[in-house]
Amino acid sequence: PVLVDVTKDVTGAKYEYNACTPAAITPKVDTIKDKDIETAVQMIKDAKKPFIFTGGGTIISEASKEVTELAHRIDAPVCDSLMGKGGFSGEDPLYTGMLGMHGTKTSNLGVSGCDLLIVLGARFSDRVTGNTKTFAKNAKILQIDVDAAEINKNIVVDASVVGDEKEVLKRILAEVPEMRHPEWTAHISE
């Protein structure tokens, strides 16, 4: 252990400095495979009870607009992780709150009852999943993440797309039609 003791006069002093902002890392778009997009689009089209789980990747990718457009296009409720807070508006009628042990009953029951869980830039931490054997056991899981190491890491998924979330969603949105699930969204909003 090391102790760095900074005196009060130094911490309270005013000084000039030049802020150093690291350059953002731009993920490669060419990692996105056409067949993975096709699979994702088909899973979304086949879903009767879709649910979106968004995480910190939405924030990093600046994909809030695309997540909102997808949610409204496919009529899917949206929950988030702590790292995903702000990636989808808390004022939106499709928003259900956080998922997991610190989450809402609506989000947790929604994930338990959905037939397709679309995971956007979120890892499956133990605070979100609880028992991994029973997490979203009735759902197919589609995971979209820039980090291939996160795919199937804690939860085995049915399909995945590796790539920048914003770019992946743009490609999915180009192919997904307007869909309505009135019974499902009514059930979630109860």
Where are these predicted regions, by residue range?
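Conformationally flexible catalytic loops at phosphate/diphosphate-handling active centers
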Residues: P1-D46, P182-T185
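Short beta-strand segments
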Residues: L3-T7, F53, V119-G121, D145
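Phosphate/pyrophosphate-binding active-site segments
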Residues: A19, Q42, A47, N138-E190
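Phosphate/diphosphate-binding loops
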Residues: G100-I151
